[in-house]
Amino acid sequence: MPPIGLSTSRTTHTKQTNVPKLWLVMVGVNQYQDEYLPNLNYSAIDCQGLSEALTEAATQFTQKIVNVYHDFAPQPPSLTNVRHSLRDITSHVSPIDTILFYFSGHGVVDPTTQEVFLCLVDTQKSNLQNTGLALQEILQILGKSGVQNQLVWLDACHSGGMSLRGVTLQLVELLQQSAAKSKGFYALLSCDNNQQSWEFPELGHGVFTYYLIRGLQGEAVDSQGLIYLDGLYRYVYHQTLQYIDKTNQQLRLINQQKRGKGDTQLYNEYPLQTPKRIVEGVGELILGKRLEKNAPGVYRGLGIVVEGLSNSKITLDISKLLGSTGDFAVEYLPATKTSSEDIKAAIARHWQQPQAELTLLYLRGRIEESEAGEWLRLGEDICIKRSWLKQQLRQCTSQQVIILDCPLGTASLGDWIEDLQIESHHGQCLIACASPPEAPENFAQKFLDTLTASAQGDGLSAAGAIAQLQLSLADSKTPLYVWLSGTQGIIEILTNNTHKSQRTSGLDLGVCPYMGLNAFAEADAAYFYGRETVTQQLIHHLRDNSFLAVIGASGSGKSSVVQAGLIPQLRQGKHIPNSEQWGIKTIRPGVNPLEALARKLGEWGETHLLIEGMLHQGVEGFVYWLRSLPQGVTVLVIDQFEELFTLAPTPDRELFLELLLGAVQYAGDRFKLIITLRADFIAPCLEVPALAEALQVASVLVPPKLSLDDYRRVILHPAQQVGLQVEAELVEVLLRELNQSVGDLPLLEFVLEQLWQQRTAGKLTLQSYQEQLGGIKGALERSCQGVYESLPPQLQECAKWIFLSLTQLGEGTEDTRRRIYKSDLIVKKYPAGLVEQTLNVLTNAKLVVINLEAEIEAQGKSFSPTPPNLSTPFVTVEVAHEILIRHWSTLRWWLEENRDRLRKQRQINHACQLWQQSGKQADFLLQGARLAEAEDIYIYWTDELGADVQEFIGACLAERKHQQLQAKNRLKQAQRAVVALSVLGIASVSFGGLAYWQGREAQFREIAALNSSSQANLLSHQQLAALIASLKAAQQVNHVIAVPNNLKLATVTTLQQALFEMQERNRLEGHKDGVISISISRDGQTIASGSLDKTIKLWSRDGRLFRTLNGHEDAVYSVSFSPDGQTIASGGSDKTIKLWQTSDGTLLKTITGHEQTVNNVYFSPDGKNLASASSDHSIKLWDTTSGQLLMTLTGHSAGVITVRFSPDGQTIAAGSEDKTVKLWHRQDGKLLKTLNGHQDWVNSLSFSPDGKTLASASADKTIKLWRIADGKLVKTLKGHNDSVWDVNFSSDGKAIASASRDNTIKLWNRHGIELETFTGHSGGVYAVNFLPDSNIIASASLDNTIRLWQRPLISPLEVLAGNSGVYAVSFLHDGSIIATAGADGNIQLWHSQDGSLLKTLPGNKAIYGISFTPQGDLIASANADKTVKIWRVRDGKALKTLIGHDNEVNKVNFSPDGKTLASASRDNTVKLWNVSDGKFKKTLKGHTDEVFWVSFSPDGKIIASASADKTIRLWDSFSGNLIKSLPAHNDLVYSVNFNPDGSMLASTSADKTVKLWRSHDGHLLHTFSGHSNVVYSSSFSPDGRYIASASEDKTVKIWQIDGHLLTTLPQHQAGVMSAIFSPDGKTLISGSLDTTTKIWRFDSQQAKTSQMNTLVMSACNWLQDYLNTNPNVTPNEQKLCPS
């Protein structure tokens, strides 16, 4: 902290004399010049700290004049400085002022005169009269000042070898005399007679001044927040006395331990120090007041409380008390809900916090030991070894308090205390206790009582806690083991809270008291509220009955009220006598209820196999076994009783019910049965007579809704249990948003859990609810959808599979949860690793629950601290709550889409189980229609069937074939008497029919396999193979009769997908080693390639190899066509350049001259010269006719890799291994400039056709664009993942192609924005070039191939990148300008032809919608700041801001005449504005949720609006009256637009559909389905024949008006928010959250590619050259497309 040394000028002193001032003279001396005065450690810092505390606290003095003198201040504490300061002050003070003199240092009595002197830095002990500051002098100066209050604070009784100890009688008398003379005198002395001032290193101050500072900082305030001088004295006196007393208490305990070990080196205790005051006439002087500080919470200590036995309320209360009064940041970890890894990580994390003064660890568990060692067990599966814990303690640098609460008794706790001891000056306290079995919470309660007693008093030190615990446990059977070390500082568990202000924020123990989608368990009873009345009803019924049915709707909380309400009450034994001794077990029936029952009952000692055998003996055996149990009464809870009717086989269900109901009847005194049952399953239960009778006797209905008071308890009381606060406003909003429906309770629990995750400083806030969750309605939907959409595509597919598998399809009832074995999810399509990865995400999101109980039972109780293996078949999986099935629309849609198939598939699975249980008897095989269904499933869904089901279907098919063969043989025998010719004819027909059907089934399987192969090849970038496989499938579909519609659709979709994604046009194969270079003749008809195989090959444009040039003795690195195409130049590793005649391959000449490899050759534009670049650091210029060397260009300091001529031939550019590009003048070889910027070799160069730009490719993974005129770097293109080996401009200069060692080619526009990546090469790509006057790119690779590429059939013409996320796009009326807007709040205007940015209209917050006026002069924006803005297009000036909406504005639209502007908002309204003056016209009210979209009809008479309330509303634009409301979709409606003639409306929705409506009567014409996610918007083409839709699935789809899908544009990398046609209908623009806007060419004829024959024709056109010329194409493939 900076030193304070402030003196105020005399002129300032004289001003405002009527205002009381505070004059401070503060002196502190550490270092003395006199060797006979020992130096001190803390006096200077005492002075500094007290000065700052006084300056800050004394706010009632508007003027404070501070004079500070200490070792670190600008002015030293010399006699001259201090004396001058005192005299100067007395000459300027007013009577109403206050003077405070403070001194910290040595005080000495002159032995001759008995005068008291304060020793300053230059005081000489031998000459006190002349060098010391006499106290008498100070008092005289203060007395003459005449001020109202004179304060003298002295800390001058320090130890350190001085002969004087304590305050002498002379000093006291002198101060008393001065007090008597003064009307207002107050002296504070650091100690009394015969005492001395103590300094403690851990305080960093003398103890007296330390508490002066603390008191002024707020701890000495009274109830009004004021600091009185007397109050400050009492605070300092008490705290000083207490601190020394606690220190001595700790030292006594440590010395006691030392004596016990025979150690004689004991610590001395500190004599008492009691500050003294001398006062006269001051009265109640207010010295300061508490300052309100908004500093973030800083905790003194860190605490972890681990509850490892049961969820004891006592340990939770300990955590709350530590957190609320002990300045602790406390984390409470119940072992039942925390993994071993998390507990160990938390302990390790807390030990490594250097800022903590104290770290406290409370572990409640049981000590266990075996031959393998000894550990502390927390819960069932968490084990903490002593060695591990000691290692953690050694890493801790703060004070430590470790408490081991280990009930049930153990002899080894003493060993733990002995082993965990660490000698540390910082301090360590170990406490261990073993409560007896009859009172397992005895120690925890005593510890809590000890904390509670000290919480609001003087605090609690570790030594004090030990003493109190020893006293309170003295008469019990609870042994206590302790250890205490540390001599520097008191280990304070609780600090003094007497003077602390109340905590205003909530606690954050890290415990979520809300269950989310999970049911409450018994361990959660402390947080279970709202069902107290129902719980009492259950207790009442169970008291007098042996059977109890708890019935309620799905989501009503049946399981929770039994587990967290009833069972904990029974275990307490307060309501039913002796119920605490009952044995209680809970099961779910599942698919094998008898086995589940046997496993659970086996926990009482018998093996589950023995019990299962006993159960099969019937009721008599079960009753006998129940009566033999020692616990008296056995309670069996069957949760989700309806599983007996949905999952269990009928024979098992009947036996199970017979056993349990028989036990109720014949052993009712020893057995009680409790079931939870969904209300919609009462009917099947009533069909069982005994069960129906029981239900009528004892059933309790759990109401689906709670009262508002109960809902309030559900919100508030769990939070109070863990110290959380809930804002009152939040509670009221939550209660208001409840719909009073069945699903309210689980949705509320889910929202509360989400709020807990968003908590702030231990508080649940309304702000978090509104900003993060957006309301109860839709919170679950948003959360589920968010988790699903965060998954990569492969995991999304697996998640869909999992959720469908975990849903039990309702048969006249609602769909329900379905619990299955995890192993059942693993099939060929979804292997174990994929399922495991997906389940991890879903379980972490708490959407799915994995149950390990069955597995643990199967393995037996293990003491291994490692977690159970999740891969065993005993692990079950289920959806967290059935509310998820009802409220997640995506899952609902999946279910509706797959319901029939799933039902059939599960029927087949059930038939398979029966077949296996029968020993695979043929009688259980499927036949007829059921077999046909199974066959369809087998053909199309093979990879989703388990191996056992596939075996079953295979056996069914084999049996059918066997029966067909038998039928055929019987037919032959019956026809033997018939004429031979007739017999042969009939047999022929029979054979033909059988063969036909068998062949047809095989063809279907082959088509499906080809489709799968195509998709797999696409994923692995084998595009040609993918298209060929898909073409084969399509050809087969065209030649097979009655292909199932779903197979035909899959084939069309696969072929369409392959065509849309095709990039590779042809593959030229013939080289035997990597291809390094290619060159293309100017007419584009010939391609030359140079290879590591030492050859040059010439290829025709269609891929035919027509000549190989041999002559080089080593690798050919470069080939180049002359401008006229008559000559080819080549260079390579043999250091030569060769010139060849193109027409016949004749070698014209060999040019030598380079001393190392020739890396590149290139002809001048006029063809007269050839430039060569070499590893010998040079570029050489040659005459092409004679081969003579014309010039050598030097300057590069390393090998030259590339050389190029500018288009005008006047400049030569070269790139080198020295990381530079150099430019030379061709005529004289003069070096023009050097371009620096690359970080690695420059591998390739290319001039733009206009010669103004140079592109360079480098091994630093970048391409750079340079302006030739001045050599300035224009742009760096980044995207490749490895060295870039080649770069070239297209002939029109609009595109750039680059080739890289990362196996890819990238296409960029001239602005450096990436347009496309071509992937398929299996080796690094060394060369790339454009075929002249075409959109085909050739590439050469180390994979020995040359490949020809063409951009996909549907690909963007241009990509605009400017906004951070594009929400809206719009065309100017003439199509010349495109406007984009988005998350960054800016509107950007672009030229539609070349994509250049014209201007940016800056904004603040996100813009969700934009609209041009029909005249094109204005543009309006819908803004997140609740406003609408209108801009002038020509200059970008903001003209008006329209204010009126109460929430974000989503959409704006101008009327056709441009006079009215409509805006749609999140405030549920549409507003109309006058454009000319910006005045508000009217509000259209009616929607019940936010309005996303608004549009005018073409005649301007009707306004259409789309809303989150799932409706479209039509309004009269003049009156604002509602014309019609259309219940349009099953989810949020995002947009609605009129077609050009106003006769139709198109709407889009979160239900993933586009719908077409007749506008005059609202009749639904078509529903367009195909998007896989939310559809945000749509637009009509200008001729009204097509609709474009934009979706979160990253695609734009184009539809015919009859609902036929024309094409899909799949290029975006994130959701597409907007897609609109240009006014001329020839282009389409799409704006996406991937930050880009893409401009697409739209040709309606080319786009019409979803008809099979058209697709086949397109595929054949694409493949023609490849099939005709590639040597590796098979003969059958060559016949795929006959001419």
From Swiss-Prot:
CDD domains: WD40. SUPFAM superfamilies: Caspase-like, Cysteine proteinases, P-loop containing nucleoside triphosphate hydrolases, WD40 repeat-like. Coiled coil: none annotated. The keyword Aminoacyl-tRNA synthetase does not apply. The keyword Repeat applies. Keywords: Repeat, WD repeat. GO terms for molecular function: cysteine-type endopeptidase activity. PANTHER family: WD REPEAT DOMAIN 5B, WD40 REPEAT PROTEIN. This is Uncharacterized WD repeat-containing protein all2124. The lineage of its organism: Bacteria, Bacillati, Cyanobacteriota, Cyanophyceae, Nostocales.
